[in-house]
Amino acid sequence: MTSPLCFWCFCVWAAANWPPGSALQLQPGMPNVCREEQLTLVRLSRPCAQAFIDTIQFWKQGCSGPRWCVGYERRIRYYIIYRHVYATEHQTVFRCCPGWIQWDDEPGCFSSLSSLGTHFSGRECSYQDTRQCLCSQGFHGPHCQYEKNKHLESELTPGFLQKNVDECAVVNGGCQQRCINTLGTFHCECDTGYRRHADERTCIKTDPCAGANGCAHLCQTENGMARCACHAGYQLSEDKKACEDINECAGELAPCAHHCVNSKGSFTCTCHPGFELGADRKHCYRIELEIVNICEKNNGGCSHHCEPAIGGAHCSCNHGHQLDTDGKTCIDFDECESGEACCAQLCINYLGGYECSCEEGFQISSDGCGCDALDEQLEEEEEEIDILRFPGRLAQNPPQPFPYLDPSLTASYEDEDNDDADSEAEGEVQGLTALYRVVCLDGTFGLDCSLSCEDCMNGGRCQEGKSGCLCPAEWTGLICNESSVLRTGEDQQAPAGCLKGFFGKNCKRKCHCANNVHCHRVYGACMCDLGRYGRFCHLSCPRGAYGASCSLECQCVEENTLECSAKNGSCTCKSGYQGNRCQEELPLPA
């Protein structure tokens, strides 16, 4: 059910295209072309919004109890119609100025109406399709307005008096701008910025900047003359055509607060370290940041390690663990199940790591991963062979091969599988005397004579005779790679160290450290080299720190320094600076 409803109209005026006319042929700037305003009848389309009322059905509740019933509702709908109306508008057209006419497709109005039908010297000039006046004998000119100079024709006649006729005195000689009279004739000239037409009398406006006039950037017209100009940041060179860059930084053209960097056609302001450039790109403002460490509170929600990051805390786990789905909780990573374990035969997983084992008839190899077959005869002999323990050395008796054996060392014999022998056995062992001791040659030392003074770490110096390392107070071990202060805070001397990558009673357990660094003989904790830190020595020192555990602060002048060595804190200076802290500027060359 619908019913019409009179509503309102939103009208938008849209002008139709102008019909083609003389304005498309004659343009402003053409010779003798004038602008005219005229009224033109145009048709316009006017959109209007119409409204009507529509009645729709819908289901509603509450008719009688919980039942539904049909209801009716009136809604207003709209549609758009277009109506055509006619109106008068002012339009600009270009026509020939009064007294002038355009012929065919001439670029302007070059013919004067005043000359049509004009009588000169009793002769009528007829303007036909040839657009040339047919002059009678004895007359000349575009409108036959000049009489031929009989005096010039008879100049060779003896005694004849010559008299010049000024053709420019009559209608300016037919010239549009300037008429130049000469002896016996004349010619037309044009003002600056114009050129003569093919008829030698009409002047056409020229563009002096046509072809850019050789200007590198811009060509501008002033009083009919071309003049070169440059973009901002450039200036004209001596030839008045090329453009060269203006160094704003050399003078006072660049109002930079701190530093100025020149560029082609412009410049850029920069600030001292610790400042930032303002919105005006000229002034500098000190940077004041409030550093909030999100990891200080509740370790950032991380189970193990927390590092501040953009957007919040970044959690990481100890070796042998992995992040749970919440990105914060660390759970055990089963290397045996994942296949990342290096075990050749048996793998035993434990919290945070794993160990390799071998089947019966095999023994673990020196790399802690593989399994070597036991020789049956050696296996029987090992049941009867005791273990001879030297200080820092464990080997079967006799200890073969050794680089050099020297009698004099007191040692004890004990069973390898029973570190806690009973007192009676100890009494018997105490009475035994070893017949050999290990002596390394050629400046080597260590359990298997594989170390030298080049392996001394953490500031350790070579002992006299190159028989070991002299360690600073806070370090110990064969090569000064173990801290003398344990995690409990008590000053204790740690046992002698193992080779890089191993720890444990027999130096057979693998360290889980990055970069193949030493680890604690007993605990397996990573002992970082200079310039590295972190639980696994996997992190390089942050900028501005160096030394053991990155605990020392670089003393370099930051704004003059390219790099501070993470190992020893030495400064690498930027170009133009010198000194142990890059604190001195190099003198300018004379």
UniProtKB/Swiss-Prot annotation:
Asked if the Swiss-Prot or TrEMBL record annotates the protein with the keyword Transcription regulation, the reply is no
SMART domains hit by this protein: EGF, EGF_CA
Domain EGF-like: residue ranges: 105-145, 164-204, 205-244, 245-285, 445-481
Which Pfam families does the record match to this protein?
EGF_CA, EMI, FXa_inhibition
Show the ranges annotated as biased composition (Acidic residues). 413-424
Entry-linked InterPro entries: EGF-like_Ca-bd_dom (IPR001881), EGF-like_dom (IPR000742), EGF-type_Asp/Asn_hydroxyl_site (IPR000152), EGF_Ca-bd_CS (IPR018097), EMI_domain (IPR011489), Growth_fac_rcpt_cys_sf (IPR009030), MEGF/SIB (IPR052108), NOTCH1_EGF-like (IPR049883)
Region (Disordered): which ranges?
393-424
> Which cysteines share a disulfide bond?
C109-C125, C135-C144, C168-C179, C175-C188, C190-C203, C209-C219, C215-C228, C230-C243, C249-C260, C256-C269, C271-C284, C449-C462, C456-C469, C471-C480
Q: Where is the EMI domain?
A: 44-104
Establish whether keyword Signal is in the entry.
yes
Q: Which UniProt keywords apply?
A: Calcium, Disulfide bond, EGF-like domain, Repeat, Signal
The organism's place on the tree of life at top rank: Eukaryota
Q: Which GO terms describe its molecular function?
A: calcium ion binding
> Where does the record locate the signal sequence feature?
1-23
PANTHER family registered for this protein in UniProt: MULTIPLE EPIDERMAL GROWTH FACTOR-LIKE DOMAINS PROTEIN (PTHR24035), MULTIPLE EPIDERMAL GROWTH FACTOR-LIKE DOMAINS PROTEIN 6 (PTHR24035:SF138)
The molecule here is called: EGF-like and EMI domain-containing protein 1
Gene symbol? Egfem1
